[in-house]
Amino acid sequence: MAMSRRLVESPLVVASHNAGKVREIAELIAPFGLEARSAASLDLPEPEETGSSFVENALLKAHAAARATGLPALADDSGLAVSALGGDPGIYSARWAGPTKDFALAMATINHLLGDNPDRSAHFVCALALAWPDGHAETFEGRVDGVLVWPPRGDQGFGYDPMFLGEGAAETFGEMDPAAKHAISHRARAFALLVAACLGG
């Protein structure tokens, strides 16, 4: 197996226009002396997410940002997959919240579609793509399993966090303080793989 490329350059462009995601990634990379610059702060356009998987979409975003800035770029594509809905919303998780990013509406939609179905199992997936301006890229994927609760609980986190209760957890992702979420989340799991491969553990 080929060695992964080491990330030594800073700043790192976080190829996301989602402020919650950018903040979470900035907190995860800070201990490695890396500074995060958000795509929005660099006036980068949001590329069309035309991939058919989380990894494909993360790669699209990372390559676009690395090419535009001449800096290494980290992109995340993540979402919620609900078992009883055939894995939806999946890669369309953000789109279910509509143009105004109304996740309260998206959560209510999921709850409505589930109806009386007792199967509330779901999982979060996070794909991370780290791309360099020369076209090289590394990808990592993390997953966390759990169940959906209704009504949503907590105002920490973002997106679908308030309705997701991780396996063995007493608090939803929306109730956990950020440090607790960072320890077990799908993003943290993908990031741990990236750290081991590209930041020297």
From Swiss-Prot:
Binds 1 Mg(2+) ion per subunit. CDD domains: HAM1. Substrate binds at S16, H17, N18, A19, G20, K21, S78, F158, G159, Y160, D161, K181, H186, R187. It is an enzyme of class 3 (hydrolase). Gene3D superfamilies: 3.90.950.10. It catalyses: XTP + H2O = XMP + diphosphate + H(+); dITP + H2O = dIMP + diphosphate + H(+); ITP + H2O = IMP + diphosphate + H(+). It holds the Pfam family Ham1p_like. One of its GO terms (cellular component) is cytosol. The active site is at D77. GO terms for biological process: nucleotide metabolic process; purine nucleoside triphosphate catabolic process. PANTHER family: INOSINE TRIPHOSPHATE PYROPHOSPHATASE, INOSINE TRIPHOSPHATE PYROPHOSPHATASE/HAM1 PROTEIN. Pyrophosphatase that catalyzes the hydrolysis of nucleoside triphosphates to their monophosphate derivatives, with a high preference for the non-canonical purine nucleotides XTP (xanthosine triphosphate), dITP (deoxyinosine triphosphate) and ITP. Seems to function as a house-cleaning enzyme that removes non-canonical purine nucleotides from the nucleotide pool, thus preventing their incorporation into DNA/RNA and avoiding chromosomal lesions. Belongs to the HAM1 NTPase family. Homodimer. NCBIfam families: RdgB/HAM1 family non-canonical purine NTP pyrophosphatase (TIGR00042). This is dITP/XTP pyrophosphatase. It comes from Rhodospirillum rubrum (strain ATCC 11170 / ATH 1.1.1 / DSM 467 / LMG 4362 / NCIMB 8255 / S1).
